[in-house]
Structure formats: C-alpha cells, structure tokens
Regions:
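S-adenosyl-L-methionine-dependent methyltransferase catalytic core, i.e., the SAM/SAH-binding region
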Residues: 1-150
C-alpha cells in the first residue's frame, strides 16, 4: 500500500472490493480525514463491507464504471483496480466460474442480473457469441470458439 497511499488525508477508490482485503489495508494507512470509496457488484462483497464500521469508508454496490457518478474530477489521490474473478468466487461451485468444480454455468458477478452464461450459450446465435468473445474477451479465435459452442 506504500506505493498507493501518497496522501493519508486523500480520497481513494477500491474499484474491486471483493472480500475487502485491499480496502482494509488502505483504511489502515489513512488518517481519520482520509476517505475510501469501494465498489463491487457482488452480494457477498456487500455483506463483507458491512463489517467495516469506519466513518471514512463507503461501499457502493455498482460497477466501477460508474465512478463519475460518485467522485468529482481531480479529487482522487489514488485508485486500486484488481480485475478478474476473486478466489472466493472460484471456490463457490454455485457461482459457475471455475472449471475445476461442478456447478451451474452461471458466471454472473452481479447475482441479481437475470442473464446467465447458460442462457447466452443456449439462446444466442453463433455471431452474437463470437462478438461477445471478441469484444469483451479480446479473443482472437472468437469465431472458431463460437462455432464449437453452437
């Protein structure tokens, strides 16, 4: 955290709260005047955030792409983004992220979102799946993979 915290009185963002490990470390480094806003879509993250009872901490259950709605320009001292699936999400078979355990093909970060990976595979066209793999996964073999799925 030494590299991230340049101003102990500053405003920091943890854009991928997960289970709160990074947020807790940031808060340990901040003065009481310093502030931390953490974002995550996951219901389990919301539950974990409830255990942090500090006045200078705020959890927002949304995608970090919504930062502009919560933070003024040029007011930030630092941002942490740890992208990807968290270990707890991989450890929970019902979340459908791991290929090492049996579970539903879910893969939703936001469990309230209705569309699952299974829905996409069963209902989307080869072209739509290819576009998803190309656009969001930057997969060079998106057409080939989509063809094998459909």
């Amino acid at each position: 955290m030494n590299s991230l915290i340049s101003d102990t009185n500053g405003l920091y963002l943890d854009c991928t709260f997960g289970r709160g490990g990074h947020s807790i470390k940031i808060l340990e480094e901040l003065s009481p005047e310093g502030r931390l806003i953490s974002f995550d879509l996951d219901d389990a993250a919301l539950e974990a955030a409830k255990s942090i009872n500090q006045k200078n901490f705020r959890f927002i259950k949304t995608n970090f792409s919504m930062i502009d709605d919560y933070v003024e320009d040029n007011s930030l001292s630092g941002i942490l983004i740890d992208c990807g699936v968290s270990s707890p999400q991989l450890d929970e078979p019902e979340r459908g992220f791991s290929f090492q355990t049996k579970g539903p093909l879910d893969m939703r970060f936001n469990q309230k979102q209705k569309l699952t990976c299974k829905d996409i595979i069963e209902n989307f066209s080869e072209k739509e799946i290819s576009t998803i793999l190309w656009k969001f996964g930057e997969e060079k073999e998106s057409r080939k993979i989509a063809k094998s799925i459909v």
